[in-house]
Amino acid sequence: GVILQYPFYAGIFGILNYSGLGAILIHAFVSITNPRFYTVVVFIFSGLLNMIVPSGGSQFIVEAPYIMPAAADMGVSLTYVLNAFTIGDLSTNLIQPFWAIPVLAAFKIRFKNIFPYCIIAFITSFIIICLYFLLWMY
């Protein structure tokens, strides 16, 4: 799995950076949002990207080249953007099984048995985090 996984992430990084898609994403981020809502957009986008690139470091390599310049263009603090990225990455770990594989194997439990609880925790945390970014970040 790992032998295929990291070259796949490098391929995503290469496509984004060398095809011009990264520049298009920077302009898209700047055009669809404003400084007030940018952290929420980064939070949601990081969560979605986490489903494709579950490794936090690899995800940062793929995502940072366009979320950071877009933040700089809008004048949003990079501290807020990095927090939104990290929390977006971590929050969607609740609904993908990679983190739970060792625990599930140790206790001989299937992911479908804990998934409903993970969904409840994810939805609750998603709402609270979005409200935090919208109400208290500025």
Question: What is the role of each PLM region?
Answer:
Residues L4-L16, V30-P69, M74:
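Hydrophobic alpha-helical transmembrane segments of multi-pass integral membrane proteins
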Residues L4, F8, N83-I87, F115-I123:
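Internal alpha-helical transmembrane segments of multi-pass membrane proteins, especially GPCRs
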Residues T92-Y138:
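Juxtamembrane and boundary regions of transmembrane helices in multi-pass small-molecule transporters
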Residues I24-H27, G57-A70, F98-R110:
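Re-entrant/interfacial helical elements at transmembrane boundaries that shape
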Residues I3, I44, L48, I123, ...:
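Generic alpha-helical transmembrane segments of integral inner-membrane proteins
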Residues G14-I26, I52, Y132-Y138:
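Transmembrane helix-loop junctions in multi-pass membrane proteins
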Residues A28-F29, T33-F37, T86-N93:
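Structural signature of hydrophobic alpha-helical transmembrane segments
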